Amino acid sequence: MNFQRMTDLNLAGKRVLIREDLNVPVKNGVITSDARLRAALPTIKAALEKGAAVMVFSHLGRPVEGEPKPEQSLALVAAYLTEALGQEVKLFTDYLDGVEVEAGQVVLLENVRFNPGEKKNNPELAQKYAALCDVFVMDAFGTAHRAEASTEGVARFAPVAAAGPLLAAELDALGRAMQTPEKPMVAIVAGSKVSTKLDVLNSLSGICDQLIVGGGIANTFLAAAGYNVGKSLYEADLVETAKQIAAKVSVPLPTDVVVADASQINFEDFLGSLAAAQAVIKKVEDVTANDMILDVGPETAKAFANILTTSKTILWNGPVGVFEVDQFGEGTKALSLAVAQSDAFSIAGGGDTLAAIDKYNVADQIGYISTGGGAFLEFVEGKTLPAVAVLLERA
């Protein structure tokens, strides 16, 4: 993919406006996870080291436009950045008509979603953002699938528009996995429903050599192959769709599974009741009417791990079992370790996948971990990300 990169630009004395994803969780006035802030720091520091006058902006939460509320302010983020950067980071609430910032300084602009027209990508608002800067840097991959004034609109009107290091790294990794994958390529796609991952499955079936499915998605594929899935989560209306996908790409199915008696499960306290449920390993052909499949069995986990060992590219989206409960997490654990130990280039994305990576402590052994949730899935689906498309246009 051809786009301008912030790292290639001369920023000395330039006014640089950086769109980051600083949408951090806040509880009782405390930031509960600073992961997104830590991810943004290298970009901000790099712009400062290049001698830029830096302005950073982001959204936080889902405020009603034009109705700013203190709990949705970026004030806590400004305090965090002040400490992390070792210099004062002032928060500007009134900035659309201009901001005073000098080379070597960084300021934070208040929550973009306080501005009427932000979400609808109002061109007048986008032009006001663009007028603040000499260079606009899009670095928020997590919002790249949204055409908003601070993501797509400003990039259209700014004198220069470039990708920041975070966004560039995401696009390079996704391009390597999806556009120029080294073969054989294996994708792991798991989740509760085929319907929510249908575009992902269809897209990957045309690219990868083998498609490992897990969770409720795997149950639908098992039903399509004629197996009884008992009380397991599956989508009867998508059995034919599963057959069509399996006709296009090799989909290795589980040969054994881990089940629980559905009558022991309280669906109003699903994870709580599962913790007390007995896990039973069964051959897939032995699943009974009252069984609920909650993980792949050890034989299947070993077979899937062997597939991953011989692959050159791995794309991973979703755990293959209810890994939050240990007796139904062995399959996801085995696959996590197999991805980590493989020599393949691996890319992982999606909230549950990241939680599994954290649980099994393999983050350092994954080639690239995508920060982008919905944007990651839309890229994998083959959809155009508006904030990326404008950077490609302007390159």
Curated annotation (Swiss-Prot):
Q: Which keywords does the record carry?
A: ATP-binding, Cytoplasm, Glycolysis, Kinase, Nucleotide-binding, Transferase
Q: List, in alphabetical order, the GO biological process terms annotated in this UniProt record.
A: gluconeogenesis; glycolytic process
**Major localization class:** cytoplasm
Please list every transmembrane segment annotated in the UniProt record, as residue ranges: none
Instruction: Spell out the InterPro entries in the cross-references.
Output: Phosphoglycerate_kinase, Phosphoglycerate_kinase_CS, Phosphoglycerate_kinase_N, Phosphoglycerate_kinase_sf
Q: In which pathway does it act?
A: Carbohydrate degradation; glycolysis; pyruvate from D-glyceraldehyde 3-phosphate: step 2/5
PROSITE patterns the record matches: PGLYCERATE_KINASE (PS00111)
Q: Describe the reaction catalysed, as an equation.
A: (2R)-3-phosphoglycerate + ATP = (2R)-3-phospho-glyceroyl phosphate + ADP
- Disulfide connectivity? none
Q: What class of enzyme is it?
A: transferase
Top-level lineage group: Bacteria
Quote the EC number.
Answer: 2.7.2.3
One Gene Ontology cellular component annotation held by this UniProt entry: cytosol
The record's subcellular location field reads: Cytoplasm
Q: Which residues bind substrate?
A: 21-23, 36, 59-62, 113, 146
Give any GO molecular function from the UniProt entry: ATP binding
Protein family according to the UniProt entry:
Belongs to the phosphoglycerate kinase family.
Subunit notes for this chain? Monomer.
Q: What is this protein called?
A: Phosphoglycerate kinase
Lineage of source species = Bacteria, Pseudomonadati, Pseudomonadota, Gammaproteobacteria, Moraxellales
